[in-house]
């Protein structure tokens, strides 16, 4: 099996349109050469780092600054997650904390 652009291919090399974006984790398609190159470069530097200790990799800090720069006024905090589920879970916890429900 493999993916190419908006298509996936089965073991018989039959091509199908993958209309669900890999369940939302491949919204830019499969095997995008620019994304493969960028991800490969980053994997060589630092593939993952937690933020538990209040430290952040330079690449994440730079991206956060760019996001704040284009966000509407007042949206000046950035929290990186691994998935939409993690983002939603964290957002709910922040609201609970803010409302003193924790």
Enumerate the predicted regions with their spans.
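Short, small/polar residue-rich loop motifs at catalytic or cofactor-binding pockets
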Residues: 1-4
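Short, acidic, Ser/Thr-enriched surface-loop or helix-capping motifs
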Residues: 10-11
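Glycine-rich loop-to-alpha-helix module at the N-terminal edge of alpha/beta enzyme cores
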Residues: 15-102
């Amino acid at each position: 099996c493999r993916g190419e652009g908006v298509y996936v291919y089965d073991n018989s090399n039959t091509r199908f349109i993958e209309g669900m974006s890999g369940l939302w984790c491949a919204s830019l398609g499969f095997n995008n050469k620019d994304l493969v190159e960028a991800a490969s470069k980053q994997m060589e530097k630092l593939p993952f780092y937690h933020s538990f200790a209040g430290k952040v990799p330079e690449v994440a800090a730079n991206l956060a600054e760019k996001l704040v720069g284009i966000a509407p006024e007042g949206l000046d905090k950035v929290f990186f997650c691994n998935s939409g589920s993690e983002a939603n879970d964290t957002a709910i916890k922040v609201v609970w904390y803010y409302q003193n429900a924790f």
